[in-house]
Design a protein with these regions (language model features):
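Condensing-enzyme catalytic core of the thiolase-fold
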Residues: 1-221
Length: 221
């Protein structure tokens, strides 16, 4: 049975999130819907700068900004745009998300991330912004741009069915690494630097490290 099936859905409404505010409906502003929507957050950038290429909000939880970069690369390769801005922003403006993560046991009590440590007990939230400007390499060289790095390949998968919808899968992690290497035409032994997810949990860290070792350990002495 082929399980390599993609799922693509358009999603817009936030009615479920608004349920707790039913009693405060009298204070809802006319522009609140556009101001809170993911699509408007991205669309505003295109609007302000007058960009007319694809303007897409990507939500894949912790991997959102990385998948956004991947999708931007594919859009460039397909000729849908000639330049792309890709990345992500995290601003902690209210305590709600921290409370949710804390109750789910995801946050370290001291707010410090101890990835791949025996003392790992969750991660610490932080604010930041990271954006890259992407172009096809031939276009960047033609235009005399300073090329900082070249993205050789990438891949995206889903865990499928695991012990829980938020539970990771070592098998899926090893698969996405292998597919990315294949797409980049790069041998595991050629990779010298690895940036990990590093959830800082007793459950997630060993799984991620094991997946990375099972792929990148091949061909190494």
């Amino acid at each position: 049975e082929d399980r390599n099936v993609g799922v693509f859905m358009g999603i817009m409404g936030q009615d479920y999130a608004f349920l707790p505010r039913l009693e405060d409906s009298h204070i809802v502003e006319a522009f609140e819907g556009a101001g809170l929507s993911h699509s408007a957050g991205v669309g505003r950038i295109s609007y302000v700068f007058g960009f007319e290429g694809p303007s897409i909000a990507v939500d894949t939880a912790s991997s959102s900004s990385l998948v956004a970069v991947h999708q931007a690369v594919r859009s460039l390769q397909d000729g849908n745009c000639n330049m792309a801005l890709a990345g992500g922003v995290n601003a902690i403006l209210a305590p709600v998300n921290s409370l949710l993560m804390s109750k789910a046991g995801l946050l370290a009590p001291d707010g410090r991330c101890k990835s791949f440590s025996a003392a790992a007990d969750g991660f610490g939230r932080g604010e930041g912004c990271g954006v890259v400007v992407l172009k096809r390499l031939s276009d960047a060289e033609r235009d005399g741009d300073r090329v900082v790095a070249v993205i050789r390949g990438g891949a995206v998968v889903h865990n499928g069915t695991t012990g829980g919808i938020t539970s990771p899968s070592g098998k899926a992690q090893a698969r996405v690494i292998s597919e990315a290497l294949q797409d980049a035409r790069t041998a595991p032994s050629q990779v010298q630097y690895l940036e990990a997810h590093g959830t800082g949990t007793e459950f997630g860290d060993p799984m991620e490290l094991g997946a990375a070792a099972s792929v990148y350990g091949k061909g190494r002495k």
